[in-house]
Amino acid sequence: MGFWENNKDSITSGLKSAGKYGYQGTKYVAKTGYKASKKHYNNSKARRERKSGKKNSSDEEYDSEDEMEYERKPTDIRSLKDPKSFPPPPLKPGQKTYTGQQQQQMPNGQASYAFQGAYQGQPGAGSMEQSQYAQPQYNQYPQQQLQQGVMPQQQQLQQGVVPQQPPIYGEQVPPYGSNSNATSYQSLPQQNQPQNAIPSQVSLNSASQQSTGFVSQNLQYGTQSSNPAPSPSFQNGLQCHQQPQYVSHGSTNLGQSQFPSGQQQQPTTQFGQQVLPSPAQPQQQQQGQPLPPPRGQVILPAPGEPLSNGFGQQQQQQQQQQQPLNQNNALLPQMNVEGVSGMAAVQPVYGQAMSSTTNMQDSNPSYGASPMQGQPPVGGQPPVPVRMQPQPPQPMQQGNIYPIEPSLDSTGSTPHFEVTPFDPDAPAPKPKIDIPTVDVSSLPPPPTHRDRGAVVHQEPAPSGKIQPNTTSSAASLPAKHSRTTTADNERNSGNKENDESTSKSSILGHYDVDVNIMPPPKPFRHGLDSVPSEHTRKNAPERAVPILPPRNNVEPPPPPSRGNFERTESVLSTNAANVQEDPISNFLPPPKPFRHTETKQNQNSKASPVEMKGEVLPGHPSEEDRNVEPSLVPQSKPQSQSQFRRAHMETQPIQNFQPPPKPFRRSQSSNSSDSSYTIDGPEANHGRGRGRIAKHHDGDEYNPKSENSTENGRLGDAPNSFIRKRAPTPPAPSRSEKLHEGTITSEVDSSKDANKYEKSIPPVTSSIQAQQSTKKAPPPVVKPKPRNFSLKANEYPKELTREATGQDEVLNSITNELSHIKLRKTNVNLEKLGGSKKVKDSSPVPSDLDEKYVSASGSITPPRPPPSRSSPKKVPPVVPKNNDNLKKKPPVVPKKKPLLKSLEPRPIEMERAYSGDISAADDNLNPFERYKRNVVPQEDDRLHKLK
């Protein structure tokens, strides 16, 4: 403690000071960090805003501020210091070296295009050329040219340089980074000087030569051999004589020959053409513009011109090499002397020639040569630099210069070039994108499926695949069309088109198998021979029609449409041919054979009415014919179907025809089942075994014709809103009579006659049938069935016992079986137990045990008449009834079980006394005893105990 007491103050003060300064430091750090982060965020946000759309990478957002400032420079290029002070920009893949600094700013503000020897690979040559361009000598020479108009004088004034070397101007472009370019630069200034003098003299005359010289200029750019500069664009006037100097660089022969003649003016125009968008256009411009453009304007060279310059560079280089090096040397010092003053005017021309970005290197040498020609006029003659000077195109020129010569030709050009290197990166991915797209189109789709892959191998091109698919679908179509011609050409054609589209879209490979199969319509058609077949065809466009022909294969053609008689006939013929419709025939026949299998007689009768309705009715009302037809129907169902179809075709109230077969079949099946016992073979055969006739047992009395007529009447009435319901039996005989008489010629007539006969002829047969049907009904209605469950089922009242006790015997047997059943967990037979309540109910014999056990059983029936005893007093106790109503009524069965256990009925009092024992023992045996009245009070007691 002493230590703390002694040092307490110092420790506390130290902690305080440490905390204070620590807090201050942390606060300062936090503030500075916050400020820095905020500043950084703002800067990055500004960067992102500026770079939006240009750069997507997040790293660029965090570029150093130096880069930001550097990127900002392009906007302030003109305000920056002389680019000569800066090192040359990085070389592009096509460039070799940057050595010369030829940029010179014109007083007009135009960025002088420094013709850098770096493009040519010789900084010295480039600088000389720059000086030459800027030299007042060039300016003086064009002035002299303008004044004197003598080309040789101008050449002499220009340092006596032979103008033959002007091809150097074009040469400069190819040697953009080579030493040969340097030589070309040297030769170019020589040529440019005489050319400058020449254009000044012949500038007015150059208009005519520009057309000729324009081609030559193209040759100069492309071949470097033509003397006349093809670009007369600078023929705007004598003012552009310095620009003709630019032209001289374009033409290799612009040298001496051009200088003495008007061709010299053409070289001037040629140089302008380089600056202009196209050599032909510059000629026109020069011709159309006799006056020199202001310096502020810059003439842009055609993108194709620098290319031409590049092509002609080699020729120009050769010519330049031919030119005396002394002249080149003389020109170079002159250029150096006046390069600064003259470059401004001349450089814009180069910038214009440089404007074509496509061939940057080619245009650069051309520009270098042209400034050699044009720079001297800039100092001496501002009108000539006017063309050279046009500044609005200069930014484009600068942009062109950078791709051509990243060196600082003009103050504003270098920063653009430094920034532009990213542009070449953008074009690089573009070809990559183009290449995969072309490959994808040329490549076949990948095989994703086995069948698909095989098809793909067969057909590499996707278009080829599609065509084979179409061919395969077309191949399937012709077969389908043949089917449709047999059935319905129109419907099938529509369906085929749908199938084609589906097959094409879904299936990629070639498939010969027809996938569009509609089995369901077949059964529908069977159900309704004609109309449903049509519906099924509609549902299944292609397969529905083929389904009908198989019926035709049997015999009758599938009716594609009720109204198409000719088609049905053709289908019949095709069906006879048995084409394509076998599977459908397999589906169609079964319903009729089923009818025959049920009752051949009934089916024959059915076939006869159907035939009667179709075509057989008018022609075959006889029974024999009917009998023959049913035999045919099971064998060849198409006949009946064809008859149906023909009948539908002839008499199109098909609705009457279609519905009857189904209700008729049902009625036959039900009647046959009811009257199967009484139907006789001869009756069934002759009368076709109508169920009702068999029921009447009057089939012998009735003629088979009448029986058939009754059936036909039923069929006719059923479709006609069930007219038979009034008297289902009588109408049938009336129709049968008419049909057998042959009075009915059509189904409609038969139905009408049948209705008349039904009203007029309710014969005794119909009443007898109704009586028989009523007599047959009571046996199933036997009321004593519930008593059959009792043990004493044999004691049924004799009234209930009938003559034909087949059903009663069955019920009695069931009850007997129930009486022999043993109860679960008791192994006691109901027969042994005579004391059950149900036994008492069923048996007239009373039993004391039952009476005593009534309360326990829970189902008390006071109306019971047991023999008089003391037990009945116990039976009606009200309390057990209340208890039974509340709890005992549902568990009637479990009450029986305890009696079965003891086999001795306990009186109600005994049950109450032994309720505890019963509940304990019964819980194991019968779970329902829990719900007895005895169990409930126990639960109440438990609740009281809990309280």
Curated annotation (Swiss-Prot):
Residue stretches of biased makeup (Basic residues): 36-54, 888-899
Q: Where is the composition biased (Low complexity)?
A: 93-105, 130-163, 256-289, 313-332, 667-676
Q: What is its main location?
A: membrane
Q: Which UniProt keywords apply?
A: Membrane, Phosphoprotein
Could you tell me where this protein is found in the cell?
Answer: Membrane raft
* Residue list for modification Phosphothreonine: 729, 861
- Which residue windows does the record flag with biased composition (Basic and acidic residues)? 70-84, 488-502, 526-541, 749-759
Q: Using the record's annotations, give every residue carrying the modification Phosphoserine.
A: 57-58, 64, 476
One GO cellular-component annotation of the UniProt record comes to: actin cortical patch
One GO BP annotation is: barbed-end actin filament capping
Skewed-composition ranges (Polar residues): 177-255, 354-367, 466-475, 633-644, 763-774
Composition bias, Acidic residues: 59-69
Membrane topology value: Peripheral membrane protein
Q: Where is the composition biased (Pro residues)?
A: 379-395, 862-879
User: Where in this protein does the record put region Disordered?
Assistant: 1-332, 354-810, 824-904
Which InterPro entries does UniProt cross-reference here?
Answer: Aim3 (IPR031370)
Return the similarity comment: Belongs to the AIM3 family.
* Self-association state and partner proteins as the record states: Interacts with RVS167.
What protein name applies here?
Altered inheritance of mitochondria protein 3
This protein's species is Saccharomyces cerevisiae (strain JAY291) (Baker's yeast)
**Taxonomic placement:** Eukaryota, Fungi, Dikarya, Ascomycota, Saccharomycotina
Q: Which gene encodes it?
A: AIM3
